[in-house]
Structures are given as C-alpha cells and as structure tokens.
C-alpha cells in the first residue's frame, strides 16, 4: 500500500525546470533534449521507444508490446491490454546528448496524459503508421502540440509492410495537418526485399543488419546512375523548400548559383533553424518492429529538435538548481519540502542529489504541487516575479489586480485544460471500513489524472466518477484493485449530457441574513441569454454603469465565481449548462457582508433563473472511423443507421477495405466494440473521439431524462 501511494505520487510529480543564460550553465543545457513521442493508438510509439533504449545501451534486450515486457508500459493493465495508459519518463544518452523522453498514450480516453506531458517537453516525435497515414488521434495530438507551440519531427513507421505507402503519409501531413513536411529520407527496397533507406541529404543508402537486432547498419554510396539522378533531384527539392523559409540558406543558394554546391552541414543547420521555428517538419522512415531506422531518428532528435534554451517561453524564464531537502514555495502559496529527487526510467528511479535547470526529474515529497505550478524559494521571489509579469500585462484590468486573492494561480499556473467527462458512474467501496481508503486512493489517481472527475452527490449520497470513456472507467477500477487492493463496485455508465437554456430570463434576488451577529445583505439582478462566446458580462447601460463601476474587483470576482459555478449543474439531469451568458445588471452588497455570502447569493440567483428559463438537453456526439472489408460495409452501415448515426463518407482503404466516417450519439454506442466484432466477424477495427454536442428530439430527450433518473 505504501509503495503504491509513493509510486502514484512519483508519477504525478514530474516537472521541468527551464532557464536561459546567464542563470544556468548553457553548455549543460545545450546537451539536453526533452522530447515527447505522440501517435495514434498502435502506430508503434512504445516499440520505437524500446528500440531507442536498447540502442542507447539502457536495456539489454528488446522489449515487445505483445510479450508484455516493455520498460515504459509497466502497469499491469498496460501489459495485459498491450496499450499505454500512463505517460512514462525515460532518460538515456545518445552521441553526447542527454535525451529525456516521455512515452505517451495513444488512446483518446487518456488524452489528458498527453496534455500534461507536453508541458514538460521542448519538442516531439510524431509516429505515423505507414499503412494508415494520419489517423483520428494523430490529428488530436498534433493539435495539442500546436497549442503548446512545439517543434516536431515525423517518423513514418511500419514501412517494411507491403501495404505501406510513404507518399500517402506525406500527402496526409499536408492535407489533414496543414504541415510542411521535409523528406530527409526515402524508402528503398534491397535486393533481398528488406527495407532500406535513402538519405536525401547525403545521397547514401542505409541498410540495417538483422542478425544483431539492428544494432549496426551499413552506409553505401549509390552506384546506379538513375538512383543518383533521382535522389539528387529530391535533394534539390529539399534545398528549394528550405531556402523558401530560411533566409541564410537562401543567401547561400543565390551566391553559389547552384544547389549542388550547398553542403550537407548547411542543409542540416537550416533544417534545424526551420524546425525550431516550426516552419517545417522533418520526415524520417523505418520499421521499429524490424529494427530499421531508429538510430537515425535519434540522430534527428539531436540535430533538429531544440534544447531547453531554444524552447519558446510563455513568460520570462526562471531558473536555478533544485536540491534534495530544499524548501520551496509554489505559486499556490504552499510551502513544500523536496524529500528526494530521482532520474526516471519508467517505473525505476535512480536517486540523485540535485537537478539543474533545463532537465527533467521526478520529485517526491510535494504534497500539493501539481503540473504547471511555479516553484520559488521565497515569497519575495514570487512577489517580484508577479510584479514583473503584471507590468507586461494590462494592469488596469480587474482580472489582474495585484490585490486579487487568486492572482498567483491565474498568472503563474499553466494548468492544462481538462476535457469534459463523457461518462459518469457511481462508485461504492466493498465495505464502509474501506470508504476512507477509497477516497484517498481516488485523490491520488485524480492528482495523477485530472481528467478523472470525483464528485459527491448530495441527493443520493453516492460518490460519482466522471471519465473520458468506458475504457477509462475500467482502468480506474482495475488500478484501484491492483495498486490499492480495493475491489470497488461501479454503477451503470451514465452519459454526460449538457444543458442549454430554452428562453432568456432576468430576475432580481434579495438575500438578507444575520450570521453570528453580523448582518449579511445582497441585492443582485442577473440575466441569462443564449451566447456561445462570452460566459459573463456586465450591463453597460446608462442606468447600471455607475453601480457596476463602483464595484470593488474582489466583489466582482466572487460574484462571477458564484454565478458561473451555478452553471455546472442544470435542473434537468444535473448536466453542465453551456452556450449561456450571465449578464450582471445591478448589485448592492451590504457593509461587512462576507465573500462566501455574496458568492452563494449569485449562485442562488442563477439557479432561480435556470428554473425560470427552462433547459433542453444536448447529447455528446462521437466522431468514428471504421475500417472494414468491402463485403462487411453494408451490414455495418445498417447497424449504425439504427443507432441514429450520420454517415459522413465511405472511401476506399486499400484494395479490400473501406473507411467509414461516422458521427454518432454516444448514448447509442454502449458496447459497440463488441457489436462491431460480431457484425464483421472480427475483421473490422474502430476508433472514436468526442466531436461536440447536439440537440435531441423530444422523444430521445424524454428517454434520456428517464434513464438519468433511474426510471428506465
């Protein structure tokens, strides 16, 4: 039990210290690469990571996902299912550089793991399945990397397979991701039929030896004149593409008046600059399972991805050295002590005495610090940083007033955006004696995985879990048993509906109460309107503007917090109320009235408005991609039609398969994976992810309400 709690704490306490000169040793930081590896499920992320560890000398044997002996997939559930659930950190050396790598999940249910990991990296490798190209989750993780402004390179995996099409992957990168791929390699078939690789920059052919698990490979000059001519044309295209985005290379091309006179070193330097500036994406290829091309991917990480010094910063850089036993202060105002510092290798930890800025480490002893918090050594340091940042913002805005109680959290925390839950279910301990242990375990799991929602339903007295999907819930239940020895019972899954108001409404609420001899008094006028952009606004009409301008920022903040908080639970099925704007018209707060009383009054006023306006249900819609043999498509489409699905497109997928693009209500997809296997006799595969919410017709809404109330 103690080990499980420690392990969970270690996994959720990863952090990255960053700094620029003159505060750190720049030479040390220049030798570091902090990278993440992202992909759609089953594209080969973990296999690629295992090969990197093996060739770097970190492991003595090749880990295989299907054998359940990989380093980075160490949870029991990961090895049983052959999928990555938790991000894993590993560190290894390659050609004089220290690479800190985070292997992330590919399944949509664990997208929060990806989001948290991206705060701790400076660049990413995106792995594509050479037989499938850009897939649904590829688009999702690419967008996440865009949001974090992360430079990236692409590794096209599984190129040894006969149905792999490199050109299609390049076309997908352009069409589906709006990327500018630079092909530094091209596929080559050797005489024996095995995959080889052409290096476009050096005009060489690379061949991997299979008798030593791909540890060595040969580099051969091209002999065929046709091969040389074709590859030189590709090299010229590469230089032409790069010179269009890199002025230094363009000047060299103009001065030499020849692509052939541009050296390999200049190309690599230009490609590095363009990659770090996110103007282009280098593309490499290989086969992780067949041990082909991985060393060159590691070379590309060193050559093209940025150091911590070159990483785009959100605010001014902060730095220093973290030492064992050091006392730190988080931006939440919590004083903490770093008890131990570790260098990670998945679930194995090597204790170190300190860690310098720019590196990645695992930290034990931080009880309240979470991903995204700023750590300083004193209140003075925090205040100085706060003042410098406020000066660079609009200091006149109430949101950034220095006296606000949450200014540290709002300005200095870079907490990831937590996706909305799509499923809910009740959770019960096996006995009352294990209730406290279950609650503590859920707190640990929630700290590690913020997409897990844990709420207490005051009406039913039950603890309610919210998650990203059926698999997410299954994994939570399994981990509670395997790591915390608590065999919980989960209730039936409930759909996470949302609600929207039927008609606009306005009301005034007056609340007066005597609490412990202190008179509390609030008079507030609020209005609810349909609005998809602005959640809270002030009425600037002449009759109200003077009243609202006289409000202290602190009062406005607690009013806003209370009003918005009331939208979290609608009157129909307790769903979040969306597409709704709260407009504050007028408010009067009596002298000495507590903030909590003002907040409660605002929430009560919004609840009154929701009852007055009425709400309608919005149901979650899933975007699905189904790959099935041609002869099975008609049966699959017929079944989807019965599930209220919208067939968006059916297109060829190779010679024998079709790709079906579908939008379907989540409520109709319970157990669909099993149904699809039955309809297709196990020959079809499917992926799905949330794509928004849609209004329901009256009959479906009535049925949903009855189900939510346990009447059906």
Curated annotation (Swiss-Prot):
SMART domains: EFG_C. GO terms for molecular function: GTP binding; GTPase activity. Residues 30-309 form the tr-type G domain. Keywords: GTP-binding, Mitochondrion, Nucleotide-binding, Protein biosynthesis, Transit peptide. GO terms for biological process: mitochondrial translation; ribosome disassembly. Gene3D superfamilies: 3.30.230.10, 3.30.70.240, Elongation Factor G (Translational Gtpase), domain 3, P-loop containing nucleotide triphosphate hydrolases, Translation factors. Transmembrane segments: none annotated. This is Ribosome-releasing factor 2, mitochondrial. The gene is mRRF2.
């Amino acid at each position: 039990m103690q080990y499980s709690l420690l392990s969970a704490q270690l996994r959720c306490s990863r952090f990255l210290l960053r700094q620029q000169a003159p505060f750190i040793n720049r030479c040390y930081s220049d030798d570091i690469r902090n990278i993440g590896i992202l992909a759609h499920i089953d594209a080969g992320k973990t296999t690629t990571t295992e090969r990197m560890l093996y060739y770097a000398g970190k492991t003595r044997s090749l880990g295989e996902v299907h054998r359940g002996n990989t380093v980075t997939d160490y949870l029991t559930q990961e090895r049983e299912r052959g999928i990555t659930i938790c991000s894993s950190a590993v560190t290894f050396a390659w050609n004089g550089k220290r690479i800190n790598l985070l292997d992330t999940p590919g399944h949509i249910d664990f997208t929060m793991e990806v989001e948290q990991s991206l705060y701790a990296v400076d660049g990413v490798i995106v792995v594509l399945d050479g037989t499938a190209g850009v897939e649904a989750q590829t688009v999702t993780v690419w967008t996440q990397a865009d949001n974090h402004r992360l430079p990236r390179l692409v590794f096209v995996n599984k190129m040894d397979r006969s149905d792999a099409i490199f050109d299609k992957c390049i076309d997908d990168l352009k069409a589906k991701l709006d990327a500018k791929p630079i092909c530094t390699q091209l596929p080559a078939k050797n005489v024996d039929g095995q995959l080889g690789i052409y290096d476009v920059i050096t005009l060489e052919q690379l061949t991997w030896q299979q008798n030593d698990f791909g540890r060595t490979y040969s580099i051969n000059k091209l002999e065929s004149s046709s091969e040389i001519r074709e590859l030189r044309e590709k090299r010229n295209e590469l230089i032409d593409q790069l010179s269009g985005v890199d002025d230094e290379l363009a000047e060299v091309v103009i001065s030499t008046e020849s692509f052939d006179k541009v050296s390999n070193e200049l190309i690599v330097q230009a490609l590095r600059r363009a990659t770090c500036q996110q103007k282009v994406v280098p593309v490499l290829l290989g086969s992780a399972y067949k041990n082909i091309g991985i060393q060159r991917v590691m070379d590309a990480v060193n050559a093209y991805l940025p150091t911590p010094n070159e990483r785009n910063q959100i605010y001014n850089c902060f730095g220093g050295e973290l030492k064992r036993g050091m006392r730190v202060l988080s931006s939440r105002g919590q004083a903490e002590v770093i008890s131990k510092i570790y260098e990670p290798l998945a679930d194995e930890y090597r204790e170190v005495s300190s860690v310098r800025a720019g590196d990645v480490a695992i930290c034990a002893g931080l009880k309240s610090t979470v991903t995204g918090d700023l750590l300083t050594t004193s209140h003075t340091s925090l205040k100085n940083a706060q003042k410098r940042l406020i000066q660079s913002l609009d200091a006149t805005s109430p949101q950034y007033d220095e006296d606000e109680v949450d200014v540290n959290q709002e300005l200095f925390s870079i907490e990831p955006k937590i996706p909305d839950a799509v499923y809910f279910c009740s959770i019960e301990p096996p006995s009352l004696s294990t209730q406290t242990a279950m609650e503590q375990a859920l707190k640990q799991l929630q700290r590690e995985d913020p997409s897990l929602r844990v709420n207490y339903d005051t009406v039913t007295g039950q603890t309610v879990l919210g998650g990203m999907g059926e698999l997410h819930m299954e994994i939570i239940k399994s981990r509670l048993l395997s790591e915390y020895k608590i065999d919980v019972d989960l209730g039936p899954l409930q759909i996470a509906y949302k609600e929207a108001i039927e008609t606009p409404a306005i009301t005034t609420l007056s609340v007066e109460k005597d609490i412990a001899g202190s008179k509390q008094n609030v008079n507030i006028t609020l209005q609810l309107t349909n609005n998809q952009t602005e959640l809270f606004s002030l009425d600037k009409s002449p009759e109200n503007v003077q009243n609202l301008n006289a409000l202290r920022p602190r009062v406005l903040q607690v009013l806003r917090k209370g009003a918005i908080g009331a939208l979290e639970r609608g009157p129909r099925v307790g769903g979040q109320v969306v597409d709704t704007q709260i407009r504050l018209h007028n408010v009067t707060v009596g002298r000495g009235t507590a903030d909590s009383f003002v907040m409660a009054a605002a929430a009560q006023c919004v609840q009154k408005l929701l009852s007055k306006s009425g709400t309608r249900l919005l149901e979650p819609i899933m975007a699905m991609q189904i790959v099935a043999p041609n002869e099975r498509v008609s049966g699959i489409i017929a079944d989807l039609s019965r599930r209220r699905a919208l067939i968006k497109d059916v297109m060829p997928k190779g010679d024998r398969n079709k790709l079906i693009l579908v939008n379907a209500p989540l409520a109709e997809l319970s157990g669909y994976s099993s149904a699809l296997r039955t309809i297709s006799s196990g020959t079809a595969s499917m992926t799905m992810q949330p794509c928004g919410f849609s209004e329901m017709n009256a009959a479906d809404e009535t049925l949903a309400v009855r189900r939510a109330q346990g009447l059906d």
